[in-house]
Amino acid sequence: PTGKMTLGQISEAGFILLLPWCFRRIGIKFTLLAGMLAWSLRYVLFGFGDAGEGVWMLLLGIALHGVCYDFFFVAGQVYTDARAGERFKASAQGLLTLATYGLGMLIGFAVAGEITDRYAQAGSHAWQSVWLFPAGLAFAVFVLFLVLFRDPAERTQGVRQ
């Protein structure tokens, strides 16, 4: 059973190799959007999957880890590096790391705990609701990013916009 979890790492290795191709073909905005949409889909799959007939949804959700992580976090790091310029690269990466792995995770874990507590029922949890909450949130971020993200640069040091 635990071997199935390696699907996430395997897919991450594959999608990291696709990242440069995606930057050239669809640009940074749509690469990031693909990652955001994959997060939403992943949470939906976890919400509706189960250990019986819906196990394929859980396995697909695990396999989506690669596109989720690489097309969102890694692509964001590459974009930040390209936009920051030589003088501010280290500071920009430090700020991004603080925002995502520091404050972002701290706030995310607190919110996840509240959501899990909110959907507690008779010694268990309404897991579908627990998973659909972040799915909806990720989709809302996807829509906001689609509408609001604008980068005036045509190209950012080899990263197509």
Residue ranges and their predicted role:
Residues G113-A138:
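A membrane-interface helix-boundary motif in multi-pass transporters
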Residues G47-G61:
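Helix-loop junctions at membrane interfaces in 12-TM secondary transporters
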Residues A84-T97:
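Loop-to-transmembrane helix entry/capping segments in MFS-fold secondary transporters
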Residues F71-G85:
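Intracellular juxtamembrane helix-capping segments at the cytosolic ends
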Residues G14-I28, T116-D117:
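Helix-to-loop junctions at the C-terminal end of transmembrane segments
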Residues L37-A51:
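C-terminal ends and interior cores of transmembrane alpha-helices
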Residues L132-Q161:
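Multi-pass alpha-helical transporter architecture, strongest
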Residues P1-A13, W56-M57, Q128-L132:
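Loop-to-transmembrane helix entry
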